A protein has these predicted regions:
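Divalent metal-cofactor coordination and adjacent catalytic microenvironments
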Residues: 1-275
């Protein structure tokens, strides 16, 4: 069974390797999961898909802290010494600011960057484990505009501009009313999603929708496939650093824990600061 943390899928890897048969499907699936976990460890990130985090920090009388996960999609709680801090609305010209928390904006495309949570009108006062923040973070397309298909089978794929669909974040009508996910046979106000394909009820045909979903950045998916392909090929030359070809020439193999091309591509996604 595929792991929720896999950075690619079996079908994509087999296409990458130009493999048609199924004899090595189990091995390739295991490689995907192992390499995906190794990549997340290198990045020092528990996951790259949208998830909820509740984190505790030591206050140091600063105005800002750097949240540990990114990109941050929303903050549901900011508390100091047990006192909830409300969000501070944008500052209008000529108007006084309102005290509260402010989140740095996220980059529109991956890899993104770690974001600050700042306070207006107060500080993260000195204390041990006295600051709590609850937030949603991970690579996500929020509110992608779409129209429910008007012809059978009433199914559509998301645009996925930065990488393959990986998790559902909900569907809502343009007026903000949420649709409910179901396992099959949707009726009005319901939808089915599988591998990034959304299916709606005939009665919702033509409805204006906003779709939210998590995705795996294409860079990370390619890194996973490149590294898995390298490990798959390594089976035929385990322990070898070179091989003589008929005594006329020698083929040398580069044996490294992380291939150079993978390490370079992963660098922009790594956590460089541990707050």
């Amino acid at each position: 069974m595929a792991s929720a943390y896999d950075l690619t899928n079996l079908s994509n890897l087999k296409t990458w390797l130009d493999i048609a048969g199924s004899e090595d499907d189990l091995l390739l699936s295991q490689l995907i999961t192992q390499i995906s976990r190794a990549i997340l460890n290198i990045l020092d990130r528990p996951s790259i898909l949208p998830g909820n985090y509740l984190e505790t920090y030591d206050g140091g009388n600063e105005c800002s802290i750097i949240l540990r996960q990114w990109p941050v999609n929303s903050v549901s709680l900011c508390g100091v010494n047990g006192v909830p801090i409300p969000p501070s609305p944008p500052i209008d010209a000529g108007a006084a600011f309102q005290a509260g928390f402010v989140l740095d904006g996220a980059d529109s495309a991956p890899p993104g960057r770690m974001q600050r949570l700042s306070l207006r009108g107060r500080r993260f006062t000195v204390g041990v484990q006295n600051v709590q923040v609850s937030y949603l973070a991970g690579y996500q397309i929020t509110g992608e505009a779409a129209m429910a298909p008007q012809a059978p089978p009433y199914a559509m794929s998301v645009l996925a501009p930065y990488g393959d669909w990986a998790s559902d974040g909900g569907v809502a009508y343009a007026n903000g009313v949420a649709l409910s996910p179901v396992a099959g046979n949707p009726i009005a106000g319901q939808y089915v999603v599988q591998n990034g394909v959304y299916t709606f009820a005939p009665s919702d045909a033509g409805a204006a929708l906003n779709i939210t979903y998590g995705y795996v950045p294409a860079d990370l998916a390619v890194c996973c496939m490149d590294w898995a392909a390298e490990r798959y090929a390594y089976r035929s030359r385990i322990g070898q650093q070179s091989k003589s070809l008929g005594g006329q020439e020698t083929m040398a193999f580069i044996v490294k824990d992380v291939p150079d091309f993978v390490a370079a591509a992963l660098q922009p996604y790594r956590r460089l600061v541990t707050p």
